[in-house]
Amino acid sequence: MIALKPNAVRTFRQVQHCSFRICRYQSTKSNKCLTPLQEYDRLVKLGKLRDDTYQRGIISSLGDLYDSLVKYVPPVVKTPNAVDQVGGWLNGLKSVFSRGKPKNIGAYVDVSKIGNSIPRGVYLYGDVGCGKTMLMDLFYTTIPNHLTKKRIHFHQFMQYVHKRSHEIVREQNLKELGDAKGKEIDTVPFLAAEIANNSHVLCFDEFQVTDVADAMILRRLMTALLSDDYGVVLFATSNRHPDELYINGVQRQSFIPCIELIKHRTKVIFLNSPTDYRKIPRPVSSVYYFPSDTSIKYASKECKTRRETHIKEWYNYFAQASHTDDSTDSHTVHKTFYDYPLTIWGREFKVPKCTPPRVAQFTFKQLCGEPLAAGDYLTLAKNFEAFIVTDIPYLSIYVRDEVRRFITFLDAVYDSGGKLATTGAADFSSLFVEPEQILNDFELRPTTKEPDSVDTGMVDEMVEKHGFSKEIAKKSQMFALDEERFAFARALSRLSQMSSTDWVTKPTY
């Protein structure tokens, strides 16, 4: 294995921050003019990707969508009149029983009567590690430059939808609505218009629906966006076939028309690659520090010195600015803030140490010991490119809330392409133990007890169905619920990927 030293890639980061600073979640126009297959061949030639016959076939099928986009002229979408949208969500109910005007945005539609004026998008589904996200990201870079585009993780998109809905209500001047003053405004038409104008091509990563509120607003929003009037082209990745979205959900029958519309507006492709790309050996960098020598205790002076050195090196590396100051003989300049105020959903959140927007540093207790939610972690991931998390203790099912928060944080950082460096009691595959094994946060009790037997059937299922390694699948068995087991196993898989040289040195989106 090759250990990546911070100084070894310092020059790359300086060049990277000078020349490549694109926010992943804002609409942008592509500067590329290559087809998806040409871009794939280019990356293979550079050694960035392995040539895979199966994936090459999938990419070839994306050529039809690319050709359609080259010739596509999206419709002009006008911002709706606030007066016409008074009545809020009740308008959606009225539309089910009435054919009258004004036309309701996002009402039920008969897919058999929909035209073909919009290019048919792609819905790519398959197991973890089969390359779905890579294929979508590759296609995203080749979208013709006359079209706007947005690439976003689905959870973050729904966070945006809910937050933007509240903002739209505040922005509308109800004083000018006459008799409608004080009444609720239907925000879906405003959202649909904004998204359609900023995202002619909308790319969702990890499309999934688990919440009834999300399902109902998504039904109306997608019905509008995928209509001829709005003309948005959808590219989505998911672990599930469209027919399995929101399965067993509350009021699912109301969501089925949305599923049918997605199937009509996209080409559904099952990605069943024989290669799990997360299992391909990569050089591991030294971003995660733990006492590799069992004779050295975490609280010892020697270990403390090593931890502090590790943190300092990686903080300075992540914090490199995108410019230099001539007065300092071209040394990198950056400023460190303590208790830095960050506004999250209208409240102030203090980051213990950071160099915005490069890096933020927390102890594990500060990050996961407090009652933070997904929205908090998504905001952090949006505002910082890298994170350092120190003093990660041994964890067990007795601190399930902290484990869940850490997994939620990790998902947010991973989905934004962020970097991570840590210090902890042990390597991540050994951090999660049985409660009786823990002596204190950073020490285990001496034991000669044989490990508990695991359900080999469940282990085999996770290996075969989801593509996890057998070691990761075994570790996940300490959790009782299937959802927890899957989330834990995915977290270990992602942590391994995030420790690779490729991940640490890739441009931050």
From Swiss-Prot:
Highest taxon of the lineage: Eukaryota
One Pfam family hit: AFG1_ATPase
One of the protein's GO biological processes: cellular response to oxidative stress
InterPro entries in alphabetical order: ATPase_AFG1-like, P-loop_NTPase
MF GO annotations: ATP binding; ATP hydrolysis activity
Annotated disulfide bonds: none
Amino-acid positions noted as binding ATP in the UniProt annotation, renumbered to this chain: 126-133
Keywords in alphabetical order: ATP-binding, Nucleotide-binding
GO CC terms: cytoplasm; mitochondrial inner membrane; mitochondrion
Miscellaneous notes: Present with 3570 molecules/cell in log phase SD medium.
Family of the protein in this entry: Belongs to the AFG1 ATPase family.
PANTHER family the UniProt entry points to: AFG1-LIKE ATPASE, ATPASE N2B
Name listed for the protein in its UniProt record: Protein AFG1
Species assigned in the record: Saccharomyces cerevisiae (strain ATCC 204508 / S288c) (Baker's yeast)
